[in-house]
UniProtKB/Swiss-Prot annotation:
Pathway: Protein modification; protein ubiquitination. It catalyses: [E2 ubiquitin-conjugating enzyme]-S-ubiquitinyl-L-cysteine + [acceptor protein]-L-lysine = [E2 ubiquitin-conjugating enzyme]-L-cysteine + [acceptor protein]-N(6)-ubiquitinyl-L-lysine. Zn(2+) 5 binds at residues 287, 290, 305, 309. PROSITE patterns: TRIAD (PS51873), ZF_RING_1 (PS00518), ZF_RING_2 (PS50089). The lineage of its organism: Eukaryota, Viridiplantae, Streptophyta, Embryophyta, Tracheophyta. This is Probable E3 ubiquitin-protein ligase ARI9. Zn(2+) 1 binds at residues 128, 131, 150, 153. Zn(2+) 6 binds at residues 314, 317, 324, 328. Zn(2+) 3 binds at residues 217, 222, 240, 242. Zn(2+) 4 binds at residues 247, 250, 255, 260. A zinc finger (IBR-type) spans 197-260. Binds 4 Zn(2+) ions per subunit. It comes from Arabidopsis thaliana (Mouse-ear cress). Its EC number is 2.3.2.31. Belongs to the RBR family. Ariadne subfamily.
Length: 543
């Protein structure tokens, strides 16, 4: 099987990406990551030529074992998503069934070769099944089924399929009732070079996207892929040569030590439109007359809906104010208000975690830009002003790399904290998180603000700058230690925490009771919303 060296690779989109200048900066970043999340590298970064070699090796292996042509093997591997072992097992179990399933027929359905020995038959023209013109046998092309079509019609048919997208990889004979596969040899024979190259690109992409062992780097414009060889218990975070870090398992931004399920729930919650409905339920009530939502900021409970409605009602019980007794002590009202307060509390809790999650991501992206500026412009200025070589200034780069990775870890700990239900574990987690965050803020402030003074040329820079070097290096080391402790604890599921470590004083009991009350409510959250909506629409709170 031949592949064009000019094959291009389409990639999935990802988050904003920075290359941190040139040289070996991505290696520096990976070294910093390894200090926070120490693990053996269980993946390999693949270039396009590496992928092509792996693909050819698989094709040649199956071709040798099954004694099939490489064209036939490609059809088989495409059908089984490039799983070599499954192809071999299925083929030796029931070859006839597999041939029928993938369209590799042993005998043609239509045979125009019966008169091969008869010289007269060689001169008989054959009618094309698409344009119905007559052609000589040399102008007709067939796949394993034998249905005859002229090469011009074949070219038009296949080109259309390829232009339609990757579905062309499983293209069948043009005869509607025929399931015979169209192989790469036919495509190369009848299509133009440009079309054939596009088909080859689809085959290459299929090897990565349909297989289970390789994935593209999701960073925009990156042509690398990653082959993962770790176990299910190991971290799925990988660092591409383009400097982008992502989770190989779920293709999201790298999120260790937080698991993929938590990340998936968190991202879904952030995108879920029901959060808008929750806010409306918690912070507004429908006018009993026109049903438009009304938000009450402050003041008394006597509400007047805006024009053209003008309906006057009580904010507490929603009863028309002209029939209002001045007391709102019905149990159903108290129950509704209790649920509303619970929703408000949950919204505040979610907002607390979301804001900090988003702010750390924003700070991380800003730190990436600051590092890029430092490496591309400021290191040269700093070297000139402080009369020292750029290699002696690597500690500033290390500090920024540490900041970037710590911001990433801290960002995802807020998603972890949102779903952490065990109160003793939550206390210990928040302690570790707080220590790590405080250390990171000191490091970030030092790198961002205290470094600025040294871009101004000084007559005697050495003493002050050396003191700064020691401070920044020390903060980098301390912050790394804080985050190592945090990551290790989260990876172990905070197993070292026991309930005895946090005796249930009165305040803890109260918090526990409130938390359990919320959990009981959350288990039946959708049903509560439905009943609450029905109650509002039916007007049971103000009749």
């Amino acid at each position: 099987m031949d592949f064009s060296d000019d094959d291009m690779i389409d990639n999935k989109s990802g988050e904003e990406n920075y290359s941190y200048g040139g040289g070996n900066e991505s290696d520096d970043y990976n070294d910093v990551v390894d200090t926070i999340i120490p693990s053996e590298k269980s993946y390999v970064i693949l270039k396009e030529e590496d992928i092509l070699k792996l693909q050819r090796d698989d094709i040649e292996r199956v071709s040798s074992i099954l004694s099939l042509s490489q064209v036939e093997v490609i059809v088989l591997l495409l059908h089984y998503n490039w799983c070599v072992s499954k192809v071999e097992d299925e083929w030796f179990t029931d070859e006839e069934r597999i041939r029928k399933a993938v369209g590799l027929l042993k005998e043609p359905v239509v045979d125009f070769n019966g008169g091969e020995k008869d010289k007269k038959c060689r001169k008989v023209n054959i009618q094309c099944g698409i344009c119905f013109e007559s052609y000589t046998r040399e102008e007709i092309a067939r796949v394993s089924c034998g249905h005859p079509y002229c090469k011009t019609c074949w070219a038009g048919y296949i080109t259309t399929k390829i232009e339609d997208g990757p579905g062309c990889l499983r293209v069948k004979c043009p005869e509607p009732s025929c399931s015979a596969a169209v192989g790469k040899d036919m495509i190369e024979d009848v299509t133009e070079t440009k079309v054939n190259e596009k088909y080859s690109r689809y085959i290459l992409r299929s090897y990565v996207e349909d297989g289970k062992k390789i994935k593209w780097c999701p960073s925009p414009g990156c042509g690398y892929a990653v082959e993962f060889g770790g176990s299910e218990s190991s971290s799925y975070d990988v660092s591409c040569l383009c400097s982008y870090r992502f989770c190989w398992n779920c293709s999201e931004d790298a999120h260790s030590p937080v698991d993929c399920d938590t990340v998936s729930k968190w991202i879904f919650k952030n995108q879920d439109e029901s959060e808008n409905k929750n806010w409306m339920l918690a912070n507004s009530k429908p006018c009993p007359e026109c049903k438009r939502p009304i938000e009450k900021n402050d003041g008394c409970n006597h509400m007047t809906c805006s024009a053209p409605c003008g309906h006057e009602f009580c904010w507490i019980c929603l009863k028309a104010y002209r029939r209002h007794s001045g007391a709102c002590n019905r149990f159903v009202v108290e129950q509704a208000e209790s649920k509303r307060a619970l929703l408000q509390s949950e919204i505040k809790r979610y907002t607390h975690y979301y804001v900090r999650w988003a702010e750390n991501q924003s700070s991380r992206l800003k730190a990436m830009r600051d590092l890029e500026k430092l490496q591309s412009v400021q290191l040269k200025e700093l070297s000139d002003n402080q009369c020292t070589s750029e290699t002696q200034l690597q500690f500033t780069v290390d500090a920024w790399l540490q900041i970037i990775e710590c911001r990433r870890v801290l960002k995802w700990t807020y998603a972890y904290g949102y779903y952490l239900q065990d109160l003793p574990k939550r206390k210990f987690f928040e302690y570790l998180q707080g220590e790590a965050e405080s250390g990171l803020e000191r490091l970030h402030h030092c790198a961002e603000n205290e470094l600025k003074q040294f871009f101004i040329k000084s007559e005697d820079p050495s003493d002050t700058f050396n003191a700064f070097r020691m401070k920044l290096t020390g903060l980098t080391t301390v912050t790394k230690t804080y985050f190592e402790n945090l990551v290790k604890a989260l990876e172990n599921g905070l197993v070292d925490v026991t309930h005895n470590e946090f005796p249930p004083d009165n305040e803890t009991k109260s918090t526990q009771e409130k938390y359990e009350e919320y959990q009981d409510y959350e288990d039946d959250f959708l049903e509560t919303q439905r009943l609450y909506d029905e109650a509002l629409l039916s007007g049971c709170y103000y009749d």
